[in-house]
UniProtKB/Swiss-Prot annotation:
Protein name: 1-deoxy-D-xylulose-5-phosphate synthase
One GO cellular component term: cytosol
Species of the source: Clostridium tetani (strain Massachusetts / E88)
InterPro entries: Dxylulose-5-P_synthase, THDP-binding, Transketo_C/PFOR_II, Transketolase-like_Pyr-bd, Transketolase_BS, Transketolase_C, Transketolase_CS
Keyword Magnesium: yes
Sequence positions that bind Mg(2+): D146, N175
Top enzyme category: transferase
């Protein structure tokens, strides 16, 4: 028997399906997504939560001309399947395969590319205003989660939307179940009255009857209005949006296609901004994801039947950072941790359990996090802001203006520095060296191995200025002794031989070390330096290399432009030396999705390519 998903041809089929067929399609879509992600990895829980929501959107709107923007974008799998990309899921997030996020080059139905949170309302408003200025007629819909709504950019956009009354539909996908049972039931009841077209007529009729009561009628009606407004302010969460000038519907059951379609159809025909508050269950339909949605947010391949993923044997940098924070904080009460909704991802769970009053999760608010850290530093604390490289760039101005200008002792623990792999352009952490290097007072460090990270963090917290420590996703297989005592701007010599010296940073030291060992087996010697400090560079060591007239190869997992290699090259040029400097890093382009090892090979930064580069310079 052919199932509904196999019979499905294009988005117009959805409008011709019965409610039973749509519900059956929902179940089949979930099964397909679970099976696909179990094989290739990806974002599971968020996608399972928006199946009915996505079907309802396509049931009501026509996104061949209407516009749909997914905030963050990791919940777009159903959308991609419905728009003809089901076959691409066998290569999901692989090089040249289907992206895990909206991509305009993939489909005419991907109207805007996303990856970071809180951007959808702004981009949707831009499209809506362009529509109005050009005299066109289409709907614009933004889907944003309750977590992303904590981002300042989303709130700025809401303020603008409500002020100018531009026609726009915002779907607030609330998957945190933040509405309690009693309040939730009452809120749903009140919402159903507000959605019902007879509600306003009923309200007018009651007010009319009361006003006809001799002597006291008008006064009672006014007081009734005040009471009604007071009750709504207390009990109806949507009053926040109503007061901003945005019509509110909800909360709605995000897994009820009939109810969702009804409300969306009403919003579609309104001439003002509308927000539809839907409540969904993250991981819906797969018990392991429902029970542990955080684990199944972004996950590698796993066993479909048990939900168990392949366990990593080694210690990741994130885990090492978390353990180091616990160890250091137990000895120094000034140390506090800050995270922007990434407590689990950055390894701070144990810290959170042991020091509940010394960890601050500010939500998706990196700008606020950095300036709050600056305030803490001025008051005598030692704040550590743990953040992914790609998200720190959202707080560039705060790092420069609020931390560096005042030369404050804030430590930036930059996780996922360098390649992160399958999440692609929006998440690769290959810019932090460049945008931090030109900030006065900033020191940048990179451990060569997991063990070195704790000693580096200890040293950073003893300094009186801003320090950034960058480290990659995953583990280190480098079996070398860590540096335990650091001297600012001093590098570590791992091998001082030959006429070529590789100066490598962070995880790239492991690749350089393996290349050195391969050459050693061929009786070829080269030098190897662990550039523990990306900034300041070790000028004394560089002067020694210049005096010995060695060729320098710099190796970094950052874009070359403005990066570590550029700093070395500029210094050598300033000395008027003629020695050759070769910078190996990423080109001036955005790096696509794919496995980390495949991407290193693609950009000529795998061990084989580095070895060839060394041999060319012999």
């Amino acid at each position: 028997m052919i199932n509904t998903l196999d019979r499905y041809k294009d988005v117009y089929d959805i409008k011709n399906m019965s409610l039973d067929e749509l519900n059956l399609l929902s179940r089949e879509l979930r099964n397909f997504i679970i099976e696909s992600v179990s094989q290739n990895g990806g974002h599971l829980a968020s996608n399972l939560g928006v199946v009915e929501l996505t079907l309802s959107l396509y049931n009501v709107f026509d996104f061949s001309y209407d516009k749909l923007i997914w905030d963050v974008g990791h919940q777009c799998y159903v959308h991609k399947i419905l728009t003809g990309r089901r076959s691409g899921f066998q290569n999901l997030r692989k090089i040249n395969g289907l992206s895990g996020f909206p991509k305009r080059c993939e489909s005419k139905f991907d109207h805007f590319e996303t990856g970071h949170s809180s951007t959808s309302i702004s981009s949707a408003l831009g499209m809506a205003r362009a529509r109005d200025l050009k005299g066109e007629n289409y709907n614009v819909v933004a889907v944003i989660g309750d977590g992303a709504l904590t981002g300042g950019m989303a709130l700025e956009a809401l303020n603008d939307v409500g002020d100018n009354k531009t026609k726009l539909t915002i779907i607030l996908n609330d998957n945190q179940m933040s509405i309690g049972k009693n309040v939730g039931g009452l809120s749903t009841y009140l919402s159903s009255l507000r959605i019902d077209p007879n509600y306003n007529k009923f309200k007018r009729d009651v007010e009319g009857i009361i006003k006809k009561i001799p002597n006291i009628g008008k006064g009672v009606a006014k007081n009734l209005e005040r009471v009604k407004d007071g009750v709504k302010q207390v009990l109806v969460p949507g009053m926040l949006f109503e007061n901003m000038g945005i019509k509110y519907f909800g909360p709605i059951d995000g897994h009820n296609i009939k109810q969702l379609s009804k409300v969306m159809d009403k919003a579609k025909n309104m001439k003002e901004p509308v927000i539809i508050h839907v409540v969904t269950t993250k991981g819906k339909g797969y018990k392991f994801a429902e029970q542990n949605p955080d684990k199944f947010h972004g996950i590698g391949s796993f066993d479909y039947m048990t939900g168990c993923s392949k366990k990593s044997k080694g210690v990741t940098y994130s885990k090492a950072f978390g353990k180091a924070m616990v160890s250091i904080a137990s000895k120094d009460k000034r140390v506090v941790a800050i995270t922007a909704a990434m407590k689990d991802g950055t390894g701070l769970n144990e810290f959170s359990n042991k020091f509940k009053n010394r960890i601050f999760d500010v939500g998706i608010a990196e700008q606020h996090a950095v300036t709050m850290a600056a305030g803490m530093a001025t008051a005598g604390l030692r704040p550590v802001f743990s953040v992914y490289s790609t998200f720190l760039q959202r707080a560039y101005d705060q790092v420069l203006h609020d931390v560096c200008i005042q030369n404050l002792p804030v430590v930036f623990a930059i996780d996922r520095a360098g390649l992160v792999g399958e999440d692609g352009e929006t998440h690769q952490g290959v810019f932090d060296m460049s945008y931090l290097s030109h900030m006065p007072n900033m020191t940048i460090m990179a451990p060569k191995c997991v063990e070195e990270l704790e000693f580096m963090l200890n040293w950073a917290l003893s300094q009186e200025s801003p320090i950034a420590i960058r480290y990659p996703k995953g583990e280190s297989r480098l079996n070398l002794k860590p540096i335990k005592n650091f001297q600012k701007g001093k590098w570590e010599v791992l091998e001082d031989k030959g006429k070529i010296s590789i100066i490598a940073t962070g995880r790239m030291v492991e690749k350089a070390f393996n290349v050195k060992e391969t050459l050693k087996e061929r009786n070829i010697d080269i030098g190897l330096i662990n550039a523990t400090f990306v900034k300041p560079i070790d000028k004394e060591m560089l002067n020694k290399i210049i005096d010995e007239e060695k060729t320098i190869i710099t190796l970094e997992d950052n874009v070359i432009l403005g990066g570590f290699g550029n700093s070395v090259l500029n210094y050598v040029r300033d000395t008027n030396s003629n020695i050759k400097v070769v910078n190996l890093g990423f080109k001036d382009e955005f790096i696509p999705h794919g496995k980390v090892d495949d991407l290193f090979k693609m950009y000529g930064l795998d061990e084989e390519a580095i070895l060839k580069e060394v041999m060319k310079l012999m």
